[in-house]
Amino acid sequence: MLITEEYRELNKQLHKDNKSFGITSAIYSDSILDMCNAINEEDVLDYGCAKAELARLLPFKIQSYDPCIEKYSNRPRPANVLVCIDVLEHIEPECLDDVLEDIRSFTKKSIFLTVATAEALKKLPDGRNAHLIV
């Protein structure tokens, strides 16, 4: 299981209520572009895309996937480069192994991954810290 329905609803609400939530990937767009240029690759999947900032910022077509965001919840096809920014620390502990396997299954060649190692400034609507596994 990638996400429980209860947690999916909490995340939907968090994304809806916080305009700044889900835009962290923009910080890394230049680094991702540099990596893609270095390996001559434009087949990219943004796994956990939130507001799909990479699709807006990068000069080539990006697959945007996020099970918490209805318009991005369709399962993607595997890509040569998978980008996963500010996602894993938000995964429910009991779902982490399945999410990691899912990420592996969608990654053909390379991955660009970030994981926060401190508590988030934001709280979930139920009061828990938004970073569940730090």
Residue positions per predicted region:
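A conserved beta-strand element that flanks and buttresses the S-adenosyl-L-methionine
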Residues: V83
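Hydrophobic adenine-recognition pocket in adenosine-nucleotide-binding enzymes
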Residues: V87-H90
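Short glycine-centered segments of the SAM/dcSAM-binding site in methyltransferase folds
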Residues: K109-F112
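Conserved N-terminal segment of class I S-adenosyl-L-methionine
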Residues: M1-A79, D97-E101, F106, T117, ...
